[in-house]
Structure formats: structure tokens, C-alpha cells
């Protein structure tokens, strides 16, 4: 599998916190960005298999939307234990957003990878979730992947943030009451793009939507048999929902594409109340509250980049 490597620009956490504080103020009424110790992510509401997101941080973009649209390429299946080795971090803790492994589940779904990959010393732990459309009523069904299957796969496309899963210093972002047009992730990404320009910065981590509701989507269980050639056609195919807090989100974003046909931002989420999917934006700006923990990635790994590409379905 082809794999290209790129070194991100990595400012200090203090510098990033200052830049993000300033940019988020344009879009949220109350903003507080600081450098803190990473909270214990094995605890509620995260319940990750590791305590933190620190150590040898990297972003991997695997496959891409052109393997899903206009028509699916069903050969594109990836093993996250192998991806960890590909990004030179066996045993990596991986989180992010991707497409569910249809070949084992038997249907298409939104995938929320939360995986401690295998190392010489430890077996892998799969804390991932997947969300699919309930055939009975068109609602959302959110399930723990390990309760259905025992592999470590995903399919078609994935945006992943990987680290050693260690405790350490992180950037904490608190943002309340949205006053501007941008969603939480886009605001952070565009802030970094404006400030750092042609020095690309990659970020990942986790955030909680503590109050409010969000617009989300889930892909249908069946891939489209007729080509989806525009965003309008894609939106007719997707199932859209409004989902309520609290939601645990797994964002991966890059300030500027250094020439690898990247999806600049991608965020999936899960919850304890059976809702999960792909995050678009909050629908309750007056009451929304975000609390996040982020780190810059040292490296980008672009794995199995599609040779033929397009810009459909990147939202």
C-alpha cells in the first residue's frame, strides 16, 4: 500500500492556545483555551482504552471519498493494526472518523475508531462504535463494534489521529454560545490556517458537546447503485438527524492541504444514549457548550491515496 510521509509544523502548545483563543472569540461568546494535564480518558464520558492522547502524535488519512463516490470500490478494506505499523507506531492508540467495515458487518455504516492497536507486549483493544440506519424506523442505531465483530478493520476512508496514548499536557478548549457561522472544528481549523498559512498544522483529540443539539448524518446501509455525482445527490442519499448532547466527538483536522488530496476536517461522535454519526454543526447556538482536548500531530501519513479524485462529499 502506497504511503507518503510529511512533517507538520508543530508550534508550542502555549502558542497554539493563544492563537486558538483569539480565533474562537470571533465565533463563540465565551472562550477559554489553556494548556492542562490530559484528563484520564479511561473515565466517563470517554471510556477510551488508554489514559491520554500524548506521545509521538501523527495523523493518518487512509483511502478517501473517491473510494465511496460516485460508486463504491468494495476492495478498499483496511486493518488498523497494520495501519499502526505503516505509520511507524505499532501499539498506537487510534481515534477518528471513517466508514464501517461493511465486509464484516454486512452493511454500510459510520465508524468511530477508538482502538489500542496490537504491540509485542499487548493484545489490541477495540473500543470502537458504529452507527447505522435502523431499517425499522429510519432512526439511528449505535453499537459497540466489539460486541458484533472481533476484527480491527475499517473501510474505504478514514481520518485518524494516532499517539502512544500517554498522559501529558494537552490544549483544553472551552467554548460556549456560538455567535458566528462556523462549526467548532471549522473555526479552529480556519483560525490555524489564517495564522500559519502555508505551514500546515494537523490536530486531533476529543471533545464533548455538553449542551445543545447537532446536525448529523448516517450513510444508508446499502451503497448507492447509481452514481452520486454531486453534493446534492449525496445529500439525498444520506440520512440526516438532529442529535442531542452529551456527545463524545473524535475530530481530525488539518489547517492546509500540503498536496495530498486531504479531507481537511472529519469528526464522528458517539454517546451513551444511542446516538452517533458524522458531526456537521450545532443547531442550538444560544445554549451549545463544547469542551475539548487537542494536540498537534508531528507527522502526516497519506495511505492508499486515490489516483482519481473529486471534491464531492467532503462536508
Swiss-Prot record:
Record: residues binding Zn(2+): 266, 268, 278
Pfam name, any one: DUF1907
Enzyme Commission no: 3.1.-.-
Compartment(s) of residence: Nucleus; Cytoplasm
GO molecular function, one term: zinc ion binding
GO biological process, any: regulation of DNA repair
Major subcellular site: nucleus
Keyword annotations from UniProtKB, A to Z: Cytoplasm, Hydrolase, Metal-binding, Nucleus, Zinc
SUPFAM superfamilies for the chain: AF0104/ALDC/Ptd012-like (SSF117856)
Main function: Exhibits ester hydrolase activity on the substrate p-nitrophenyl acetate, in vitro. Regulates DNA damage and repair by regulating HIF1A degradation via chaperone-mediated autophagy (CMA).
Protein name, entry field: Ester hydrolase C11orf54
Gene name per UniProt: C11orf54
